[in-house]
Amino acid sequence: MVTQYPLVDITARVGEVNNIRYPMAGMTSHKVQVGIYNPSTDKNIYLNTGDPTNRYFTNISWAPDEKSLYLIEVNRDQNHVKLCQYNAETGELMQTLYEETHPKYVEPQNPIVFLPWDDTKFIYQSQRDGYNHLYLFDTRTKIYPETHTSANGGTYRQYCKVKQLTKGDWLVSEILGFNAKRKDIIFTAIEGLKSGHFAVNTANGKMNQPFSTSQESEHNGLLNASGTYLIDRYSTKDQPRIINLVDTKKFKETVNLLTAKSPYEGYQMPSIETGTIKAADGTTDLHFRIMKPTDFDSSKKYPVIVYVYGGPHAQCVTGGWQNGAR
């Protein structure tokens, strides 16, 4: 059904052609079903999603009681998504909880995550205000699904009570976990070349102020089971790696586990400069990185290698080690 696309393996002594299935734009796409296998009965059931032609079923997650599952359906134009709940025993649609559209595209990247202390509430991630943020859904409180205009130029309809937990000109990149005692969500966020770990309270919406004192850096985190401490692994432009144990109550360093030395210490290294230029819309900042040779002379002309990757989901210029240069 899906057209084969040839890939040449140049690592073999004699080049070999390996065909893969790739749904090229405008050509036939595969028809996918979502099935559930029960090991105790050795039987399969399939969700009654209707005709699967030109429909994608993504970001599947189980309900805490395992009696239903959730998925985010995307049309092939990828400009309309629906968050749906299906019965895991019958495969029937139970309810639609949310819809979102955009003239260009809508891009759900993460399955919903239920609160560990309340199986009627879950976190949904959306870019409907222009940045990826966290939204708290309360499935107990049903509302009439009116259509609203999004800040990013699209529309949305919600069928239950929804509260936006994070907001600002920055984006949530990863949910690390929860602190059930404090009712906090611990997450990683990015603003330009800055990144860091933060917490937002699901009860009152309060959070430690993002990026108020952050430096340009690139952070990765590993949270403990109770959500009280995390291992913060990060780098800056000039520092290859720092690993700290961090208390998530105030996000203060508790113990420094590692401060690595530069592997290039004593070597002459090219200079690295960063900055921004405006995109075609005249508003959006596009970050760039310039690397100059050690003996750079501004009065001379040099050949230039220009590398651009338009994405998505690949931040080439970062606040981390050597600003992301390799």
Task: Go through the PLM ranges and name each one.
Residues 1-46, 150, 241, 249-262, ...:
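Predominantly five- to eight-bladed beta-propeller fold
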Residues 2-7, 31-33, 78-84, 130-136, ...:
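Structural motif
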Residues 2-6, 66, 72, 212, ...:
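Serine-hydrolase catalytic core recognition
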Residues 19-33, 50-74, 80-88, 93-125, ...:
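Conserved beta-propeller blade repeats
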Residues 33-41, 128, 282, 307-311:
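Glycine-rich, acidic and aromatic/proline-enriched surface loops and short helix-turn segments
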Residues 38-42, 88-90, 139-142, 201-205, ...:
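Short loop/turn segments that connect beta-strands within beta-propeller blades
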Residues 43, 93, 118, 130, ...:
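Cysteine-rich, disulfide-stabilized extracellular repeat modules
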Residues 45-48, 93-99, 145-167, 208-212, ...:
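Beta-propeller fold detector
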